[in-house]
């Protein structure tokens, strides 16, 4: 065989090898891309908390990208913005509904039976509207204002005593989510700002976390706070009403707080409603924001909507495991 023939055969063989190697590389790339667009990603694969059936993620690649950004930024850049009722507190325990901050008062001995019935009627009427998947936030908005104003008026009529609130919380069935000690203590240890933005009753909320031993100095609460007269009797509520669907306005009113945290451009947001998605609207310099949503009710009707708006959706999940696992990577 002459040299030209040998060279030709070598070229063909070389081309075949290149094609084969190229095919392997392409296959590897396609496999990697498929994996990235699938449910799991490298970081999430390493986190057993993400493998639970309660965890739903529409875009794992995006979640990995955000978590990588949070890890890179570390403690110095992080802040937490969170709802309270049914987000930090439990929705249910052993099949029984747990109370919200308002419910703690509604169910207490400070309220007459007649008032309790009226409050329950309001809840039955308006809660159905709050979680109705067929209504927009704009359509729900006036009903929420109506509900809160009527409920607060009934509470004012009862002449609630400030010095009884601690006892009322102690006697209630309120429970914080599993893993709350680790969540609050780790954030306190690293001095990470925690902004609790609640449409509940601030006095009750503060008492709950105080009694749980987690009301640390890094925690700021913005909520509906009671206004008491000189005798400690409820006479009204301070400031403008915060309800589940006007947190955007409230967030903008707290821009001074967020300005002080201008270097904390990475956010983990936790909520349980569509209204909670706007809690970070007062932050001007967001670099990375991871939105974690708890879906507690009407799962079949609302799951798709929640997955479209929250990065991670936790269905009927009564723990802070996922948030804690992310904090473990960052801090």
Swiss-Prot record:
CMP binds at residue 130. GO terms for cellular component: cytoplasm; cytosol; endoplasmic reticulum; nuclear body. Keywords: Cytoplasm, Hydrolase, Magnesium, Metal-binding, Nucleotide metabolism, Nucleotide-binding, Transferase. The keyword Ribosomal protein does not apply. Its EC number is 3.1.3.5, 3.1.3.91. It catalyses: N(7)-methyl-GMP + H2O = N(7)-methylguanosine + phosphate; a ribonucleoside 5'-phosphate + H2O = a ribonucleoside + phosphate. Mg(2+) binds at residues 83, 85, 272. N(7)-methyl-GMP binds at residues 130, 151. Substrate binds at residues 198-199, 247. GO terms for molecular function: 5'-nucleotidase activity; magnesium ion binding; nucleotide binding; transferase activity. The active site is at 83 (nucleophile), 85 (proton donor). The keyword Nucleotidyltransferase does not apply. It is found in: Cytoplasm. One of its GO terms (biological process) is CMP catabolic process. Pfam families: UMPH-1. Induction: By norepinephrine/NE and adenosine which are released by the embryo under hypoxic conditions. By stimulation of beta-adrenergic/adenosine receptors in definitive red blood cells (RBC). Belongs to the pyrimidine 5'-nucleotidase family. Nucleotidase which shows specific activity towards cytidine monophosphate (CMP) and 7-methylguanosine monophosphate (m(7)GMP). CMP seems to be the preferred substrate. This is Cytosolic 5'-nucleotidase 3A. It comes from Gallus gallus (Chicken). The lineage of its organism: Eukaryota, Metazoa, Chordata, Craniata, Vertebrata. The gene is NT5C3A.
């Amino acid at each position: 065989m002459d040299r030209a023939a040998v060279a030709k055969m070598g070229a063909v063989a070389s081309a075949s090898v290149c094609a084969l190697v190229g095919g392997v590389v392409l296959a590897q790339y396609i496999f990697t891309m498929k994996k990235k667009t699938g449910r799991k990603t490298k970081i999430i694969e390493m986190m057993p908390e993400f493998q639970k059936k309660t965890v739903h993620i529409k875009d794992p690649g995006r979640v990995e990208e955000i978590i990588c950004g949070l890890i890179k930024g570390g403690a110095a850049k992080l802040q937490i913005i969170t709802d309270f009722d049914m987000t930090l507190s439990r929705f249910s325990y052993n099949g029984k509904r747990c109370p919200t901050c308002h419910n703690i008062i509604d169910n207490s001995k400070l309220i007459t039976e007649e008032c309790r019935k009226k409050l329950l009627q309001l809840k039955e009427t308006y809660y159905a509207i709050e979680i109705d998947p067929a209504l927009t936030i704009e359509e729900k908005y006036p009903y929420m204002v109506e509900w809160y104003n009527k409920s607060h008026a009934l509470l004012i009529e009862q002449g609630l005593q400030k010095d009884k609130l601690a006892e009322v919380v102690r006697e209630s069935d309120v429970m914080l989510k599993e893993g709350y000690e680790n969540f609050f203590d780790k954030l306190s240890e690293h001095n990470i700002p925690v902004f609790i933005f609640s449409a509940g009753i601030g006095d009750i909320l503060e008492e709950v976390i105080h009694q749980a031993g987690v009301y640390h100095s890094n925690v700021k609460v913005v909520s509906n706070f009671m206004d008491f007269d000189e005798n400690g009797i409820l006479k009204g509520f301070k400031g403008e009403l915060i309800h589940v669907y006007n947190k955007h306005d409230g967030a903008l009113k707290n821009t001074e707080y967020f300005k002080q945290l201008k270097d904390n451009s990475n956010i983990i947001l936790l909520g349980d409603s569509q209204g909670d998605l706007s809690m970070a609207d007062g932050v001007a310099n967001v670099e990375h924001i991871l939105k974690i949503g708890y879906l507690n009710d009407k799962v079949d009707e609302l799951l798709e909507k929640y997955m479209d708006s929250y990065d991670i959706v936790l269905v009927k999940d009564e723990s802070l495991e996922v948030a804690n696992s992310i904090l473990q990577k960052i801090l």
